[in-house]
A protein has these predicted regions:
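C-terminal "cap" of GNAT-fold acetyltransferases
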Residues: 108-151
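Short coil/turn segments at alpha/beta junctions that flank glycine-rich nucleotide-binding fingerprints
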Residues: 74, 90, 106-110
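Short coil/turn motifs at secondary-structure junctions
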Residues: 66-68, 86, 119-121
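Residue-level recognition of the GNAT/N-acetyltransferase active site
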Residues: 79, 84, 117
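Acetyl-CoA-dependent GNAT
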Residues: 1-73, 79, 97-99, 103, ...
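Conserved acetyl-CoA-binding loop-helix of GNAT-fold acetyltransferases
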Residues: 83, 89-102, 125-129
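Acidic/polar helix N-cap motif
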Residues: 1-3, 84, 120
Length: 151
């Protein structure tokens, strides 16, 4: 479909960017992702198109619904945020995040979460401007750090 092709193309562009790791999506990911996304009800995506350029895909947000045990409610993790270089600075990400928040509220989510690289100052500035903050419970314990372990 047009939307899935846009999603794969935008995600591949993001993966190739230094903020996305600097490597293209694997052939496996490109061919398997459409079916994998369709089978997971806890995932949703928001796409942005520039209709003045013939419905050119210019933005993508992929989200994963999780669960807050403390609140006993769903939460939505904003997993990928992509805006093509030619369209940055036009508040496309902000508009997509407004829609993500509406969808999350519709799902009964208690909060949105996301990770941002410390060197991605433009993204961090946007996120703070629209209400995101570093995660912490007790200020004396500091804020959370995002960690990973490859399997």
């Amino acid at each position: 479909s047009l939307h899935m092709a846009a999603l794969i193309g935008l995600l591949d562009g993001y993966a190739r960017d230094p903020a996305g790791g600097g490597e293209p999506l694997s052939d496996f990911a490109k061919t398997s992702l459409p079916a994998a996304l369709r089978t997971r009800e806890n995932l949703f995506s928001v796409l942005a198109f520039d209709d003045s350029l013939g419905a050119l895909p210019v933005g993508l947000i992929n989200c994963v619904e999780g669960f807050s045990t403390f609140a006993c409610k769903p939460l939505v993790n904003v997993h990928d945020v992509v805006v093509v270089t030619s369209h940055r600075g036009q508040r496309i990400a902000q508009k997509m995040l407004v829609l993500v928040e509406q969808i999350a509220r519709g799902r009964g989510a208690c909060k949105l979460t996301l990770e941002v690289l410390s060197g991605n100052l433009a993204a961090a500035t946007l996120y703070r401007r629209i209400g995101f903050a570093n995660y912490q419970l007790d200020p004396t314990m500091g804020h959370a750090q995002f960690m990973q372990k490859w399997l």
